[in-house]
Amino acid sequence: MQPSRGAGSALLVVALTAVLVMAGTAGAQEFLGPPIEVYTQNAGKGARIVPSGQLVIDRHRISCGNRATVLDPNLDDYGAAYPGYLILNPKLLEKVPTSVKLWIHAHECGHQFRGSDEEKADCFAVQRGRRQKWLTAEGLEQVCAFIGPARGDSMHFAGPERCQAMRRCFASSDVE
């Protein structure tokens, strides 16, 4: 017995829906990045997870909501973020002042709450630092000295433009 024309169309709709759902799921997994345990296992020697609320940087206990931080000495930058967790390179961080270390953590935390926009993450970081009293005007200038030489790229403005925007955020009472 052959299926009726209507049954064939219904079967095609079900098959296409399944393909679209699976494609959407694959895309979502790709966007979310690897789970923290998978990242840590693949990061190489020395990577470890610090649970939320247990990270201490230069005698400052810091957190990013309920998100853990991976300390990864093999990371090719000072910090990074995937949705749900932060990544810091302790070997690179030991070379910069405390205000810069805390700003880097807060910047990566900003991505958790403000998304991928770098300017919003910068603003989040300096406003958080000001509110939590670990970032002063002098500390902001240390951050600006740190990023000042940076060239812009597809995600970041050049260092001087980023500093100008961060100074405005630091001075503003509006939470951004």
Walk through the language-model features, giving the residues of each.
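Catalytic zinc-binding patch centered on the HExxH motif and its immediate surroundings
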Residues: 55-84
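Long, well-structured alpha-helical subdomains associated
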Residues: 134-176
